[in-house]
């Protein structure tokens, strides 16, 4: 089984699409900022590091096997400007499970773009790819990301205390999850945030 999204993935204000070499400057613009990288599993990146990822892990356009991530750029539909990225990891084909992550340029925070992009990636995971369960693993100090997971209808299932040694400290991890049936029930009831909020 392979997961073949049709690009771009559209939402009211955004287009999600695979990143390419033309995006190097835009990717470096936010992935080089130390504060952006504080809670994510990578260090600030320069153009060389971004180029290596574009030729490797980020070159993927489809998901063909467990453990593969799909990284999509978050582009403003009105201007074509790349302002962040979202990731869908296909964790298990057998269990139809995945994980999401998101990174946004800080100049665009507080405007609902991260919520809209994550909402769209969950729609892809559940409604287009048929996954059953999606998780988000959040550093407990990353309050914005935890609030975003809750806005998406994800429930906090665990608080793992000093779960791993991460960037020079013992890190607590919050695990959030949502099932496909829960996602569809929330969408049908109108309880999910508007994709643009």
Name every feature range the model reports, one short phrase each.
Residues 62-67, 154:
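Short loop/turn motifs at secondary-structure junctions and domain boundaries
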Residues 60-63, 110:
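Short helix-to-loop capping/linker segments positioned immediately adjacent to catalytic or ligand/cofactor-binding
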Residues 46-49, 58-60, 103-105, 193:
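Juxtamembrane/interface motifs at transmembrane-helix termini
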Residues 1-38, 71-197:
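Acyl-donor (CoA/ACP) binding surface of acyl/acetyltransferases
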Residues 35-58, 70-72:
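Conserved GNAT-fold acetyl-CoA-binding loop/helix
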């Amino acid at each position: 089984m392979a997961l073949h999204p049709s690009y771009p993935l559209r939402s009211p204000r955004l287009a999600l699409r695979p990143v390419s070499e033309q995006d190097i400057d835009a990717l470096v613009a936010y992935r080089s900022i130390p504060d952006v990288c504080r809670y994510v599993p990578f260090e600030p990146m320069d153009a060389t590091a971004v180029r290596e990822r574009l030729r490797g892990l980020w070159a993927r356009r489809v998901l063909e096997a467990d453990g593969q991530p799909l990284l999509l750029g978050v582009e403003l539909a009105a201007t074509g400007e790349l302002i962040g990225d979202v990731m869908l990891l296909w964790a298990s084909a057998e269990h139809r499970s995945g994980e999401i992550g998101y990174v946004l340029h800080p100049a665009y925070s507080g405007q609902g773009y991260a919520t809209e992009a994550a909402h769209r990636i969950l729609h892809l995971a559940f409604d287009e790819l048929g996954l059953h369960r999606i998780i988000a693993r959040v550093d407990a100090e990353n309050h914005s990301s935890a609030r975003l997971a809750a806005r998406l209808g994800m429930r906090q299932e665990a608080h793992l205390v000093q779960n791993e040694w991460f960037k020079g400290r013992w890190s607590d991890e919050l695990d959030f999850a949502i099932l496909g049936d829960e996602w569809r029930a929330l969408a049908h009831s109108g309880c999910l945030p508007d994709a643009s909020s």
